[in-house]
């Protein structure tokens, strides 16, 4: 899991797939990966999410890491996701037992937080990365930059309203990485991959 976490930090972003047309989702995942997306998340509220995930896993190179999102019930979602090959699991909330179960399965747990208290609670539960959601309505780069010093040790993944145009504002404010969904285009992915590579060179 530490290796997955480090890969996420280096990548700077996770591409999120959500939709009602499984075939289109698979093609979008293939296209995003080809454009340089190193992480693909399939949300569990997507139609035939299991099929989409496994089709993509069979088509993508091993260096593209895959995970699931919108985990609402840990016990019913995580064992199956681990069997599919999920290496990380995101939730907009903090399902009971999510962190412990995911980590027992070798899956990086990323529970959600809409407030500073929830962020700290997720950290205390053992989460190595916490999803800030919804980022643009419950958080802002200024809020993230202004959190109390003890909370700065918490790795954060702002998601919800993040775009290629504002992702670096969040990273500059202290975000570990960001999640991008329907706003992410193939061109954005190519540009983001290059920009994240440049950032690693500058920040190294």
Model regions and ranges:
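Conserved N-terminal beta1-alpha1 strand-loop-helix module at the mouth
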Residues: 1-87, 104-105, 153-156, 164-165, ...
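Histidine/lysine/aspartate-rich catalytic loop segments that bind and position anionic ligands
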Residues: 92-138
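Conserved beta-strand positions in the central sheet of alpha/beta enzyme cores
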Residues: 41, 67, 90, 110, ...
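Catalytic cores of alpha/beta
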Residues: 73-84, 117-125, 149, 156, ...
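Short, charged, surface-exposed secondary-structure boundary motifs
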Residues: 76-77, 98-102, 119-126, 140-143, ...
């Amino acid at each position: 899991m530490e290796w997955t976490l480090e890969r996420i930090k280096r990548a700077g972003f996770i591409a999120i797939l959500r939709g009602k047309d499984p075939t289109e989702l698979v093609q979008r995942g293939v296209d995003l990966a080809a454009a340089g997306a190193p992480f693909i998340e399939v949300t569990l509220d997507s139609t035939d999410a299991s099929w989409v995930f496994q089709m993509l896993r069979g088509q993508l190179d091993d260096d593209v890491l895959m995970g699931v999102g919108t985990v609402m019930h840990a016990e019913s979602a995580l064992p199956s996701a681990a069997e599919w090959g999920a290496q990380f699991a995101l939730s907009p909330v903090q399902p009971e037992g999510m962190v412990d179960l995911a980590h027992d399965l070798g899956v990086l747990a990323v529970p959600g937080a809409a407030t500073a208290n929830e962020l700290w609670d997720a950290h205390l539960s053992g989460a190595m990365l916490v999803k800030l959601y919804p980022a643009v309505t419950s958080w802002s780069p200024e809020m993230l930059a202004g959190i109390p010093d003890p909370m700065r040790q918490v790795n954060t993944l702002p998601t919800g309203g993040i775009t290629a145009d504002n992702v670096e504002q969040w990273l500059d404010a202290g975000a570990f990485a960001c999640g991008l969904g329907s706003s992410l285009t193939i061109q954005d992915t190519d540009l983001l991959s290059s920009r994240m590579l440049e950032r690693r060179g500058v920040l190294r």
